[in-house]
């Protein structure tokens, strides 16, 4: 875990709690995404690394962000600038969306298959995982031809390996025992 992630977590939590209270999760997600993109811009990155005062940094950052931020979002920028944390915006954004997904009972699921899955297969996998995990599932599918056949599903700490490669490995281990 990076230092910026540790630094970002309390800011993300504060922004998340505020957004939940105001019923503005999507708006705050958009503001933080924009701020993360701004903070990652090379010119802005160099500016943030400079010797400007916190007040001036906040002012410049707010001008760059323009109408994207409401007064509460601008307050977050000011607080982060005062604490020298504007560089942490990408991590704040990442942590905010982790909290948002947890709050909305959503989970990203990585599905790796030997061949491209049909829409029916994706729908079936999604449906079964939603039942098992009691969450809305967002599938991210990829292809790995070395699997031969089958799928590997990763959802958080859960890994379901139903690939031909893993079955062959288990058979090989059983035969060698």
Swiss-Prot record:
Functional description taken from the UniProt entry: F(1)F(0) ATP synthase produces ATP from ADP in the presence of a proton or sodium gradient. F-type ATPases consist of two structural domains, F(1) containing the extramembraneous catalytic core and F(0) containing the membrane proton channel, linked together by a central stalk and a peripheral stalk. During catalysis, ATP synthesis in the catalytic domain of F(1) is coupled via a rotary mechanism of the central stalk subunits to proton translocation.
Organism (species): Vibrio atlanticus (strain LGP32) (Vibrio splendidus (strain Mel32))
HAMAP family under this entry? ATP_synth_delta_bact (MF_01416)
Origin organism lineage = Bacteria, Pseudomonadati, Pseudomonadota, Gammaproteobacteria, Vibrionales
Q: What is its main location?
A: membrane
**A single GO CC term, please?**
proton-transporting ATP synthase complex
Which GO terms label this protein's molecular function in UniProt? proton-transporting ATP synthase activity, rotational mechanism
Which region is the signal sequence? none
- Which is a Pfam family this sequence falls into? OSCP
UniProt record similarity statement: Belongs to the ATPase delta chain family.
Write the protein's name: ATP synthase subunit delta 1
Where is it located?
Cell inner membrane
Keywords for this entry? ATP synthesis, Cell inner membrane, Cell membrane, CF(1), Hydrogen ion transport, Ion transport, Membrane, Transport
- Kindly give the SUPFAM superfamilies that the UniProt entry links to this protein: N-terminal domain of the delta subunit of the F1F0-ATP synthase
What gene is this protein translated from?
atpH1
Membrane-related topology note: Peripheral membrane protein
What binding partners and quaternary form does the record give? F-type ATPases have 2 components, F(1) - the catalytic core - and F(0) - the membrane proton channel. F(1) has five subunits: alpha(3), beta(3), gamma(1), delta(1), epsilon(1). F(0) has three main subunits: a(1), b(2) and c(10-14). The alpha and beta chains form an alternating ring which encloses part of the gamma chain. F(1) is attached to F(0) by a central stalk formed by the gamma and epsilon chains, while a peripheral stalk is formed by the delta and b chains.
Q: Does the keyword Nucleotide-binding apply?
A: no
């Amino acid at each position: 875990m990076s230092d910026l992630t540790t630094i970002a977590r309390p800011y993300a939590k504060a922004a998340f709690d505020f957004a939940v209270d105001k019923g503005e999760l999507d708006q705050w997600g958009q503001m933080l995404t924009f701020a993360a993109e701004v903070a990652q811009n090379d010119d802005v990155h160099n500016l943030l690394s400079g010797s400007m005062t916190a007040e001036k940094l906040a002012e410049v950052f707010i001008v760059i962000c323009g109408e994207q931020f409401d007064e509460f979002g601008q307050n977050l920028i000011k607080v982060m600038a005062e604490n020298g944390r504007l560089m942490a915006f990408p991590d704040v954004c990442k942590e905010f969306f982790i909290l948002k997904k947890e709050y909305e009972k959503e989970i990203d699921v990585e599905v790796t298959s030997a061949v491209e899955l049909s829409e029916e297969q994706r729908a079936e996998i999604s449906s079964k995982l939603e039942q098992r995990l009691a969450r809305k599932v967002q599938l991210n599918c990829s292809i790995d031809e070395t699997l031969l056949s089958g799928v590997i599903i990763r959802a958080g700490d859960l890994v379901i390996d139903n690939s031909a490669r893993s079955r062959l490995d288990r058979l090989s281990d059983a035969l060698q025992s």
